């Protein structure tokens, strides 16, 4: 089974490119524009060298890699297959030679084509089916209760993202926040790493780790950080306090 980076806590940045307005043209670095993926084609939709939120997202992914974020989960569900593949391929290329692992949400076809890992939502492919077919693939799984957790772990997931722990607009469809006690129970029931998700901030990250979480997964914590590298340093320091 694929090995996760050996960092404490594990940090997972979940992307949300739709919340990123282009700033200053939103252009990706010239090096990226010079080496487009074959999957990008010639259309503007697939190109990562154009101005716009996708250019900003790739820049953020580069910053997250440079800062030492362990896992980057790309979940741009609104993109076409071609555009998503181009983005994931570009992210994988930038992470090559580092400890950062790139995963794509729900899209097994894109993960395999780009050489990325796969993150499975509860409504996605069964973890066991994917693990059986692809023994070496890095697989994460979203879980909202212990039954889902046990099923994902038994199926061969490498790690669990559990939540929502705290109130967050992004997770309202999943009901009220589960809270730290449910997180603690999930950690106690699992033999694989459990990452806390949902409303995680610098202010409550320590409480998640005190509940036993092996790491933290978030959108805003990383994507809207004033200084991403400093945020990562502060989160890493929590395990040494």
Go through each PLM region and give its residues:
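As written
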Residues: 156, 211-213
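Structured catalytic cores of enzymes that bind and process phosphorylated ligands/cofactors
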Residues: 1, 213-215
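Conserved N-terminal beta1-alpha1 strand-loop-helix module at the mouth
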Residues: 1-34, 46-119, 124, 132-158, ...
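Glycine/threonine-rich flexible loop motifs
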Residues: 170-172
